[in-house]
């Protein structure tokens, strides 16, 4: 893997993992648009992807470090019988993580095999954009009805939405923000819950494959560089997005991008079919 391609993939992962535009979809579509071939069976690819996931997770942990300390403290306080908002939210995150954790372990590889056609990925990106636009409309219609505290039912509903992100073209952060909007959360609260909810999922995706990273010692330098670049890109992305949604930023903007990008990619790959 050339240095510039390594940098390109690392930054692409760090940005698109958190922006509601589908990191997996972009990782498949963008290189193909530029004629770059990614060998999924290359021995150096898996360790590299592991490092990228860990870099993203560490960036999220660092950005929300004070929040996580409060959540963990509240969780143990609640176990001791002292009810508190942080402990409640921690339980909500645990409940929201369960659906994707189970389905991901059972079906992720099968889903990836079915949706490796880039035209299908482009269609999924278009649908993702439409859903973002609809989610934005719903959130704005309920702007003054947001609950003070997320219920466990809402958390489970948002967690179910994460399952859709196993399909390339659908965004994990996008789907969970949409679900949060449908559940009645403000844009800012939906974004925060989405990023907090995604942290254990992204971290687990890296940790489960961590032994393979250490077995590929000759690839550690590339993997380490990729992880660091991804962490920087992810940190800057989450910082921007939280400020964006605090300032009444709209999901619809990302929805428009996804539809335009998806339509362009669909047309391109219809005219230039890729080997399946």
From Swiss-Prot:
Any one GO BP annotation for this protein: response to antibiotic
Subcellular location: Cell inner membrane
InterPro entries linked: UppP
Reactions the enzyme catalyzes: di-trans,octa-cis-undecaprenyl diphosphate + H2O = di-trans,octa-cis-undecaprenyl phosphate + phosphate + H(+)
Signal sequence segment: none
Cited Pfam families: BacA
Keyword Hydrolase: yes
Note: Bacitracin is thought to be involved in the inhibition of peptidoglycan synthesis by sequestering undecaprenyl diphosphate, thereby reducing the pool of lipid carrier available.
Protein's name in the database: Undecaprenyl-diphosphatase 2
Organism: Burkholderia cenocepacia (strain HI2424)
Lineage: Bacteria, Pseudomonadati, Pseudomonadota, Betaproteobacteria, Burkholderiales
Gene that encodes it: uppP2
């Amino acid at each position: 893997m050339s240095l510039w391609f390594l940098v390109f993939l690392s930054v692409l992962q760090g940005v698109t993992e958190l922006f509601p535009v589908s990191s997996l979809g972009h990782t498949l579509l963008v290189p193909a648009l530029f004629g770059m071939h990614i060998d999924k069976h290359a021995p150096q690819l898996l360790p590299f992807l592991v490092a990228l996931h860990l870099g993203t997770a560490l960036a999220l942990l660092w950005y929300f470090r004070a929040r996580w300390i409060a959540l963990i403290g509240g969780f143990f306080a609640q176990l001791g019988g002292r009810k508190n908002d942080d402990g409640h939210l921690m339980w909500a995150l645990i409940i929201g993580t369960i659906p994707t954790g189970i389905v991901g372990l059972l079906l992720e590889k099968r889903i990836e095999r079915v949706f490796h056609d880039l035209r299908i990925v482009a269609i999924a990106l278009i649908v993702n954009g439409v859903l973002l636009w609809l989610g934005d409309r719903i959130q704005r219609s309920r702007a003054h009805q947001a609950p003070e505290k997320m219920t466990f039912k809402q958390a489970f509903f948002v967690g179910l939405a994460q399952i859709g992100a196993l399909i390339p073209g659908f965004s994990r952060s996008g789907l969970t923000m949409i679900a949060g909007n449908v559940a009645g959360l403000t844009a800012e609260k939906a974004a925060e819950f989405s990023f907090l909810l995604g942290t254990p999922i992204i971290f687990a995706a890296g940790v489960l494959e961590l032994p393979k990273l250490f077995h590929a010692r000759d690839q550690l330098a590339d993997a380490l560089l990729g992880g660091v670049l991804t962490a920087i890109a992810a940190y800057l992305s989450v910082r921007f997005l939280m400020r964006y949604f605090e300032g009444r930023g709209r999901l619809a903007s990302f929805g428009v991008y996804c539809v335009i990008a998806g339509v362009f990619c669909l047309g391109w790959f219809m005219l230039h079919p890729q080997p399946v």
